[in-house]
Amino acid sequence: MTKIISDRIAVYLLIGGLLFRTIIALGLYPGYDEAYYYVYSHNLDWSYFDHPPIVAISTGFGTWITGLVNQFTIRFGTLLLYTGSLCLLYLTALKLFSLPVARMTLAIAT
């Protein structure tokens, strides 16, 4: 994790992408699938036919933290998971290739 923090360009890309996705999450109304996931998050079980439990956990995380139900809190867990995935993608590209490749990978995925 310190490798990401020491690379300012990577930090700027991560923060910029997170801010952009946050603005989009605040502006768009929930779709049918997100409303379904919200209702689904209140009836947790080990597995369902159509989705694994992580979908319900990531959807219900924001409403559990804040106690509010709106388009941002429904998408909050997904925003965190995607940012974490970008960090892992950057670290993988850095380990396998080089710093410029890791930055380019992060820029493309962001």
Region annotations inferred by a language model:
Residues 22, 56, 67-75, 82-85, ...:
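Aromatic- and kink-enriched transmembrane "portal" helix at the membrane-lumen/periplasm boundary
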Residues 7, 89-110:
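Transmembrane-helix signature of polytopic, membrane-embedded enzymes
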Residues 20, 24, 63, 90-98:
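Membrane-water interface at transmembrane helix exits
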Residues 11, 76-98:
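Transmembrane-helix motifs of polytopic, lipid-linked glycan transferases
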Residues 26-37, 47-73:
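Extracytoplasmic catalytic/substrate-binding loops of multi-pass membrane glycan-assembly enzymes
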Residues 43, 60, 64, 94-95, ...:
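Transmembrane helix-loop junction
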Residues 5-31:
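Transmembrane signal-anchor helices characteristic of membrane glycosylation enzymes that use polyprenol
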Residues 7-15, 57, 76, 103-107:
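Hydrophobic alpha-helical transmembrane segments
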